[in-house]
Amino acid sequence: MTCSVFIGTSLDGFIARPNGALDFLPMDGGEPHGYSEFFASVDALVIGRKTFETVLAFVEWPYGNKPVIVLSAGQLDFSKLRDAKVEQMAGPPAEIVAKLAARGFQHLYVDGGITIQEFLRAGQIQRLTITRVPILIGQGIALFGTLPHDVKLKHIETKQYVSGLVKTEYQVVG
């Protein structure tokens, strides 16, 4: 099982403003940055409750018919989602990954600040793709939290785009 992160941040490392707003991230869909290819490579998404609630406010469900697993111990309401494949799970990251692997999933897209941090701390992330937006927002929700130990990364590739975005891919090696 491979667990990957594909996320955008401000240059100062924030994935959202303090109130969760994503207005500093380009959403125009203009210049391709590899997201479509990445998304096509994953079997399912694992997101946290806050990310799920943010996505519910979008005009369209962005995940199509890909299975989405929402991590939450509390009850969630999926009634607004008609054709989406959404389910709820709870538990430690290693347990979630094992359960999904047993169901035949091979590549998970892990998204959402707290969820990414928990999976990284548990050693469940194998690949990180981080696209930095050329803006400093000064405060917000950080991509990375505290870690029990260093996480060594191997640089795979960096691409710079005309828009000023810089996408870097890393393999987690320890």
Predicted regions and their residues:
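Enzymes that bind and transform nitrogen-containing heteroaromatic metabolites
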Residues: M1-G174
